[in-house]
Amino acid sequence: MAATLGSGERWTEAYIDAVRRNKYPEDRPPESHDPCGCCNCMKGQKEKKSENEWSQTRQGEGNSTYTEEQLLGVQRIKKCRNYYEILGVSRDASDEELKKAYRKLALKFHPDKNCAPGATDAFKAIGNAFAVLSNPDKRLRYDEYGDEQVTFTAPRARPYNYYRDFETDITPEELFNVFFGGHFPTGNIHMFSNVTDDTHYYRRRHRHERMQTRKEEEEDKPQTTYSAFIQLLPVLVIVIISVITQLLAANPPYSLFYKSTLGHTISRETQNLQVPYFVDKNFDKAYRGASLRDLEKTIEKDYIDYIQTSCWKEKQQKSELTNLAGLYRDERLKQKAESLKLENCEKLSKLIGLRRGG
């Protein structure tokens, strides 16, 4: 028993002495005696786990990470050939469906949330798609000409250019602010606080362009004011001459309507078409016989021109109401359009009949 303990103590002392002579670096653990191979098994499991984590999470631009799902989402956006595919909606999608799709994708692809390569461009494409499809006029124009423009700009089936064919009135950043007030729903992350380099370049470039434009406008402002005055000078001269001419000219001998300011308060009718007109108290002394007949022809011509213009306006108003009723399927507008009377058109028909009869 003592011999056994003695040999065990000697073995322990020898092991400690070996450890002292061969110290391991602090950053490398000592290799342990593993006759069963358990350590190798655990090491294999760790390497396998590390490979799985790498397949799920990869390094993005800078020190940010992104998932495989985010990368696949960006690649899907790049492959889309129209705005409907980008938002993942049908061509007859309603406004609510468009808003719902945009809200979901904007949060998913915002550069603060998605650091995958191309996420910024995908975010811009999503914003541009919603800005166009949410505008009735632009959506109608896109539905009519969008496919033709795709064929023209991409004859070799290249990815669709989302930024040139249809220009929007609002940037993706401003559109995101409209929906989320400049913040994510959590309220913690501000717009573009950690975006990629191309987005910073995009914002710096536009800031520089705005400053340059403002500087040029300030430099050209005096010259622009002077040029505008020179251009308006002929118009001002014409207006002044016209006013002076009207002040110096004598009052017209008649009016188609009652005008007390001109003294045209006495009602008369033309002999041929019974067109009503108004004159002053001295009219009978100035116009008799042939001069009266010539003047009444002029009156009838002026009246017919006035009635024709009024008739055209009535038809235009009725046509617009009818089109609006059909567009919005509004029964009230339809009834209003049908009940609208074309009084001046009826007067014009009577005048034409009288002229033919005369």
Swiss-Prot record:
SMART domains: DnaJ. GO terms for biological process: cellular response to misfolded protein; chaperone cofactor-dependent protein refolding. PROSITE patterns: DNAJ_1, DNAJ_2. The chain crosses the membrane at residues 228-248. InterPro entries: DnaJ_domain, DnaJ_domain_CS, DnaJ_subfamily_B/C, DUF1977_DnaJ-like, J_dom_sf. It is found in: Endoplasmic reticulum membrane. It is a single-pass membrane protein. It comes from the Eukaryota. CDD domains: DnaJ. Signal peptide: none annotated. Keywords: Chaperone, Endoplasmic reticulum, Membrane, Transmembrane, Transmembrane helix. Residues 82-146 form the J domain. This is DnaJ homolog subfamily C member 18. It comes from Bos taurus. The gene is DNAJC18.
